[in-house]
Every structure is written in structure tokens, then in C-alpha cells.
Amino acid sequence: MVIDITKKYPELKEIYELTVNHTIWRKKECINLIASENVMSPLAMLLYLNDMMHRYAEGKPFKRFYQGLKFVDELEVKAQRIIGELLETDYVELRPISGTIANATVFKAFAEHGDKAVVVPVQAGAHVSHTRYGTLGGLGIEQVEMPFNIEEWNIDVDGAKKVIEKVKPKIVILGGSLYIFPHPVKEIAEAAHSVGAKLMYDVAHVLGLITGKVWENPLKQGADILTSSTHKTFPGPQGGLIATVTKDDYKKVSKIVFPVFVSNHHLHRLAALAVTGLEMKYFGRQYAEQIVKNAKAFAEALAENGFKVIGENKGYTESHQVIIDVREHGGGAKNAKLLEEANIIVNKNMLPWDKPEDIKNPSGIRLGVQEVTRWGMKEEDMKTIAEFMRLVVIDKRDPKEIRNKVIEFRKNFLEIHYGFKISGEEETKLLKIMLHGEV
């Protein structure tokens, strides 16, 4: 498809084609297994295209520095209530525009330059923002790693307690970007609170599993603060949030969000976030349960196809993630590229035994099933995907040959599940409203 105006302006044609080609490729022709991505429902996407993307708001609802925000203010409060209900707290801050900004806000609110934070090792899953190389280090806070038990694929609780007692950090950070089992919140909370530290749990990857009630809510287990993005297992627009147990902690983070890290907070995402929150309220448990079922089935199928899947002794996974060690097949970077040629999208990932210099071609590949689950795939489909991966990585078949199989397979999964359904006619009407204000 080419629109007429692109014939007159070649530069515009290139921009148009890159955008359209990407959309068709990723939405209709790929199997996306990136653990940090998801897709919104058509209703959420259409409401994302609203006039609020052109508008500015500084401050909190009904206390803004700009006029013209009466509907925005009501919408933001409504979105806070929806997310708060899902997380069982009255204290939700939606203004962070990413998970990293949410993390930075908490770090700044509860620690100062020169203070210490105890975190999960980066090779064992800590997000880069939790490290000396990222946001934590940028704020001058010292990263101290807690020990990790590779056999259990989880934090070494006794070792972590000793580290916390010894260094007396201001913040202890759980969660991250690579983890397949829940972190031990109660035990670590006791240790953190015994030295006066705040326990922050970065639930970006598992927010949908928590709001879907298949993972326990860390705020009910002893965590003081949750930070998160809103677009992984929680299938909303890209953005961030902070939730706290107490009003005092909420006030502290709110004073830091604005004006320290955020001025305007990308208002157009609020409607899509609220819609996704309602979708999780009504369909979230079914969605989250299927995610975990699919992840377990995928891990088992990968193992049966000859892959070295992490966590076998623990049932492989309790989350959306599956981790494979592909050292014997050439490493994570090489195989991620080969799989991309076959339209299977994954990412390389460091594993606990990797050294810092291995970052360009680490041992692992991280896989996530939250998006394919939203496209309606079930356990049997995980077996098919595992076979596609075996053909590329282990059997060394031509990725282009497998690509054709992948494209054909994806034709069966073009409708988003676990969300509100609207008709094609309603989509067209809503699009006209969003683009032109036509009612």
C-alpha cells in the first residue's frame, strides 16, 4: 500500500514504508518471544491515539501548572484507582514515563549520594538501572550484590541476609529483567527492615502475573514499594508506575517524580493504561494462568528438542520467561541473529556464570511467552515454536526456509485475546474521532 503524497516526497515515502513494513512484519509474520514486550488490544491502541499526546501537564491532578486539563485530570485519577484496585493499595503514582524513571525516583527518594543499595547480581537478572553502570550508579549510590544460588535459580537468602546486615544499605532491590521464580520477599523484607532499609521490588516483568493473581503481591509480603513498567506481562502502553504501602512513602516519591525526573508525563497513554487495567480486572487471571501454562509447556518442549533449559530441577519456570543456555551452539548473540532471520524474535542474555566481557555474546537466550499468549497461542503451539527453534539452532537449517513456516503458522493467530472486543465498524468510527474529532 502506498499513499499518494509519498509519490511527491521521496523522504516521506521512506519513513512511511519503514513504519508500515515494521508493523506488518512484527504483527503478522513474526513469533515474538522478547520477554519485555507485549501488544495492546485494538481498543487500547485506538484510545492511545488521542489528543492528549499534544497536551502538557505538570504537577498532580487538579493542581496543574497548565489549563485545559479537566478531562485529563479525571482520567488520571480514574487510572490510578483502577491500578490501585489491582495492586490493593491507595497509593499509586502513574507519572513515571518508564520503569527506569520509576526506579530512579525511588532511588532518589530513599538514598543519597554515597549510600549503598543491595541488589541481585546483573548476570542473575538485575535490570541495568539497578547497577553501577545504570541509574543507581548515575545517582552516586553504591551497588552491593547479594549472593545468588544457581542450583535454585534464586537469591541465596541466608547469604543475602548477611550482606544486608553487614553493609546496612538504604535500599534493598528485588526483581529484575531475568527471573523465572518469585524472589523471597518475606525473608528479605525482614532483613531490610532490621537495618532500616526500604525494600523495593521491581515487578516490571511480572506485573501482569501479579495483577492476574498467579503471583503473590509483594506489597502484601513485606515490600515497601513496587516499581514497574506497564507493557510486559501487563499488556499496556509503554510507561512506568510506582505503588507504595504507606502514604508517607507515596508523598516522598511523588515529590521526586515531578519536578526531578518528569515534567510532562505523556498524557495520551493514560486512557490506554486504564483500559488495559480494566482488561486485567476482567480477563487478567485467565491470561496470567495461560502465560504460565505456556511457559512451562514451552520449556518442556525445548528440552525435548535438545535445548539446555535452565531450571529443570525446579520445573523450569513459574513466570512468563524461559531461559536456554546455548553456549554449545555458538552463544546467545549468534543464535538470536539466526532466529531473527527465521522471524523468531528473541534476545541474547547474560547468565550467572558469564563474565563481564561476555556481554557481546553471552551464554543465554531469554524467551517470553506473554505476547504469543495474547495472540491466542496455547500449550500445543509452544511445541511447534520449540521445533522451529530446533531446526534453526541445533539442526542448522537455513533460517529463510523456516521463516516461511513461521509466516504460515502466524496466519492462525491474528486476533488479540484477553481484552475488550470491538467491531470493525466501531474501530473505524473511533479512529475518525481520534484523528479528526468527528463524532
Swiss-Prot record:
Function of the molecule: Catalyzes the reversible interconversion of serine and glycine with a modified folate serving as the one-carbon carrier. Also exhibits a pteridine-independent aldolase activity toward beta-hydroxyamino acids, producing glycine and aldehydes, via a retro-aldol mechanism.
Post-translational modification N6-(pyridoxal phosphate)lysine, affected residues: K232
Pfam family, one: SHMT
Protein's name in the database: Serine hydroxymethyltransferase
Top class in the EC scheme: transferase
Cofactor(s), by name: pyridoxal 5'-phosphate
Residues annotated to bind (6S)-5,6,7,8-tetrahydrofolate: A126, H127, V128
Location relative to the cell: Cytoplasm
Annotated family: Belongs to the SHMT family.
One GO cellular component term: cytoplasm
Known EC number: 2.1.2.-
Self-association and partners: Homodimer.
Single biological process term from Gene Ontology: tetrahydrofolate interconversion
HAMAP family, sorted: SHMT
Keyword ATP-binding in record: no
Species this chain originates from: Staphylothermus marinus (strain ATCC 43588 / DSM 3639 / JCM 9404 / F1)
Residues in coiled coil: none
Record site feature (Plays an important role in substrate specificity), residues: H231
